[in-house]
Regions:
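Short Gly/Thr/Asp-enriched flexible loops that form oxyanion-binding sites at enzyme active sites
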Residues: 57, 147-157, 418-421
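ATP-dependent carboxylate-amine ligase catalytic core
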Residues: 23, 27-37, 63-154, 170, ...
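N-terminal leader/targeting and accessory segments in enzymes
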Residues: 1-48, 52-67, 76-78, 134, ...
Length: 426
């Protein structure tokens, strides 16, 4: 019998293409593992904010007394973070319990000529754990896109689509409407769907998909926000949806979380219509206590954010300019080569007075010197570090006693930084 570390190694060592769209492999894995898919699922797609939205909804449902499951990606520091039961990462005993049948099923498929990806194995592992642990409800985050994503085997009780932006364009398309069409692929027949505020073209894509599937559609708009006051550690917001939600405290910082929380409230209202018991108190307490690491996360005088695409980096820039307007800032950053775009470079230049670049521990990483050169060409004062440890030390030296270190560029980089800072993942 394999232990947790061996199971995780087997998952990471599976078919090395890393990403493959389709459903059959996950269905075959689940069939071989005798997983019945009985757990009620909320399925969430989107470019940005889907992880935060999932985390907030899970926190609310847990406060309401439900036994919850949560599946997200990628992880920051440890694989087990991706699969949570009642808010806690999958423990070693459950990893062994559900991981061994998973590895055996994958080996049988390889012997039959099929090859599974790490994401397919992770999806099957999560669904097996939710089923085996008799979760009352689980929230499943799409990996990429939606229409062809391996998570799209689920038959959810509710779908949600968060903010749409330009990311994964080689796979999903070069326009917001094309990307929205891929995200809308999670919409199922007669299944309610909640959609984040969006531009008219994107709203039209969602409306057409919902009509095709006879899915009750709730398209949100910023008109429902009655009052909002942001600070460096969260926000206090009032909304008018099916009911008025007064002075909702959000524990996740950033103005973008106001719209994510709006989606959560609309999802709560829809679940209530389906018969789920979710008291107002559970909603207020759940949103006020949500923890989602590396999303504008404060660690002393350091601010860690997983921003890794134009929309995310712009949200980070807006946050530091609004909440830290007179604060000297040092940026510590590492990015993936296939993610970096011109808009991101300009926004990173605006975030800080001094920039230190590092090379993330990822085969897709952009070399730190190449990154620093690109920033300098756009007017920044940037320098490359040879390692994360060297970069962190240099950022601290530049920050001195009065500056804030802002760390961003990649979730992989953010996870490595949390480890370097001694932050626990459990």
């Amino acid at each position: 019998m394999l232990n947790s570390e061996e199971i995780i190694a087997a998952i990471h060592g599976s078919y090395a293409t890393g990403s493959k769209n389709g459903f059959q492999n996950v269905l075959t894995l689940l069939d071989k593992m005798h997983v019945a898919l009985r757990t009620p699922i909320v399925h969430v797609a989107g470019t940005n904010g889907k992880g935060s939205t999932c985390a907030m909804l899970e926190s609310v449902l847990r406060r309401a007394g439900y036994h919850t499951g949560l599946y997200t990606s990628p992880f920051l520091q440890a694989y087990q973070e991706r699969i949570r039961l009642d808010g806690l990462p999958l423990d070693d005993a459950r990893m062994v319990k559900y991981g061994n049948p998973l590895v055996q099923a994958a080996e049988e498929m390889r012997a039959e000529g099929a090859f599974v990806t790490p994401f397919e194995m992770g999806t099957a592992l999560a669904l097996a754990a939710f089923d085996g642990e008799n979760c009352d409800i689980a929230i499943v985050e799409v990996g990429m896109g939606g229409r062809k994503d391996p998570t799209n085997i689920v038959h959810p009780i509710l779908c949600a689509i968060t903010a749409i932006g330009l990311d994964h364009m080689a796979y999903l398309g070069n326009t917001l409407e094309a990307i929205a069409g891929e995200k809308a692929g999670i919409i199922k027949d007669n299944t309610p769907v909640v959609c984040h505020p969006a531009k008219e073209g994107v709203r039209r894509v969602f409306a057409e998909a919902a009509e095709k599937h006879h899915a009750p559609l709730r398209q949100l708009s910023d008109d429902t926000i009655l009052y909002a006051a942001c600070d460096a550690h969260g926000a206090t917001v009032s909304y008018r949806l099916s009911q008025e939600w007064q002075d909702v405290r959000l524990n996740l910082p950033g103005a973008h979380q106001i719209e994510n929380a709006m989606s959560v409230l609309a999802m709560v209202e829809e679940l209530r219509r389906q018969g789920w018991t979710i008291p107002d108190q559970a909603v207020y307490e759940g949103l006020a206590s949500t923890v989602w690491p590396a999303r504008l996360e404060w660690c002393g005088r350091s601010l860690i954010d997983g921003a890794h695409n134009p929309q995310g980096v712009r949200a980070l820039r807006n946050f530091v300019e609004e909440q830290l307007p007179n604060q000297r800032r040092v940026l510590l950053t590492g990015v993936l080569a296939d993610k970096l775009q011109e808009d991101m470079l300009r926004d990173f230049c605006a975030i800080a007075d001094d920039i230190v670049t590092v090379t993330p521990d990822n085969p897709r990483a952009l070399d730190a010197q190449t990154y620093a050169d690109a920033l300098c060409q756009r007017g920044a004062h940037a320098q490359a570090a040879k390692s994360l440890e060297e970069g962190l030390a240099e950022a601290k030296r530049l920050a001195g006693d009065d500056a804030v270190i802002v760390a961003a560029g990649s979730l992989y980089f953010a996870g490595s930084l949390r480890t370097a800072l001694g932050l626990a993942w459990r």
